[in-house]
Amino acid sequence: CWFPWC
């Protein structure tokens, strides 16, 4: 993922 919440 490219997001911290993935």
From Swiss-Prot:
List of residues that carry 4-hydroxyproline: 4
Entry's family note: Belongs to the O2 superfamily. Contryphan family.
Disulphide connectivity of cysteines: 1-6
Localization: Secreted
Tissue: Expressed by the venom duct.
Annotated domain remarks: The cysteine framework is C-C.
MF (Gene Ontology): ion channel regulator activity; toxin activity
UniProt function note: Its target is unknown, but this toxin may modulate voltage-activated calcium channels (Cav) or calcium-dependent potassium channels (KCa).
Modified residue annotations for Cysteine amide: 6
Main location (coarse class): secreted
One term under GO cellular component: extracellular region
Highest taxon of source: Eukaryota
Keywords: Amidation, Disulfide bond, Hydroxylation, Ion channel impairing toxin, Secreted, Toxin
Stated name of the protein: Contryphan Co838/Co854
UniProt KW Protein biosynthesis keyword: no
